[in-house]
């Protein structure tokens, strides 16, 4: 679907320079001289490179609609991650580097959303919050309750994050998978 350059919004996926790009930031600029334009920060969906482009209102670009499908994580085999389509039960194999460092948070039976363009996977979204166990954490020091200091901890998946001083090894916590930060202690319904 063709749209004008001034209609590009953050989150839109467009085809530009023969590749797929997602608009990260958009800023409508009206200079004193000349016509208005839309300053857009684009991120390439295939290799992650960034690009700043100016689109005039008269320019048209191709807006792309991505298909989003739910997949269930089955298992890891070497560097390959195997997922199953929740509707057709077909299996999809993706390389670990396609998911990135967040691949460590994948758990058996976890539902993820895969973005497809012409039946080819171009992106994956994990749940924003995941329950994990702390396997190693320094003991809390006396007198640290006054300041809001955090201590390093290692999770069951090998990821290192900062946790509050009252957290100890063996406890379940909720971690933000996007920012890789501690959110809260896990309760019974999170497990």
Swiss-Prot record:
Single biological process term from Gene Ontology: peptide biosynthetic process
Transmembrane segments: none
Record's keyword annotation contains Secreted: no
Subcellular location: Cytoplasm
InterPro entries, sorted: Elong-fact-P_C, NA-bd_OB-fold, Rib_uL2_dom2, Transl_elong_fac_P/YeiP, Transl_elong_KOW-like, Transl_elong_P/YeiP_cen, Transl_elongation_fac_P, Translation_prot_SH3-like_sf
SUPFAM superfamilies cross-referenced by the UniProt entry: Nucleic acid-binding proteins, Translation proteins SH3-like domain
Keywords in alphabetical order: Cytoplasm, Elongation factor, Protein biosynthesis
Cited Pfam families: EFP, EFP_N, Elong-fact-P_C
One GO term describing the cellular component: cytoplasm
Molecular function as annotated in GO: translation elongation factor activity
Pathways involved: Protein biosynthesis; polypeptide chain elongation
Main location: cytoplasm
Signal peptide range in chain numbering: none
Protein biosynthesis found in the keyword field: yes
Family listed: Belongs to the elongation factor P family.
Annotated function: Involved in peptide bond synthesis. Stimulates efficient translation and peptide-bond synthesis on native or reconstituted 70S ribosomes in vitro. Probably functions indirectly by altering the affinity of the ribosome for aminoacyl-tRNA, thus increasing their reactivity as acceptors for peptidyl transferase.
Protein name (record): Elongation factor P
């Amino acid at each position: 679907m063709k749209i004008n350059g001034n209609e590009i919004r953050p989150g839109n996926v467009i085809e530009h320079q023969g590749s797929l790009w997602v608009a990260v930031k958009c800023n409508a600029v009206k200079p004193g001289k000349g016509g208005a334009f839309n300053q857009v920060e684009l991120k390439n969906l295939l290799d992650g490179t960034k690009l700043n482009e100016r689109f005039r209102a008269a320019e048209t670009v191709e807006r792309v609609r991505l298909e989003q499908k739910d997949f269930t994580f089955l298992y890891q085999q070497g560097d390959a991650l195997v997922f199953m389509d929740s509707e057709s039960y077909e299996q999809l194999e993706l390389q670990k580097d396609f998911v990135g460092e967040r691949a460590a948070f994948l758990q058996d039976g976890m539902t993820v959303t895969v973005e497809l363009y012409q039946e080819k996977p171009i992106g994956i979204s994990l749940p924003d919050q995941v329950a994990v166990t702390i396997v190693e954490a320094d003991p809390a020091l006396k007198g640290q309750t006054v300041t809001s200091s955090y201590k390093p901890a290692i999770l069951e998946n090998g990821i290192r994050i900062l946790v509050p001083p009252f957290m100890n090894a063996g406890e379940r916590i909720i971690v933000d998978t996007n920012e890789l930060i501690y959110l809260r202690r896990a309760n019974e319904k999170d497990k």
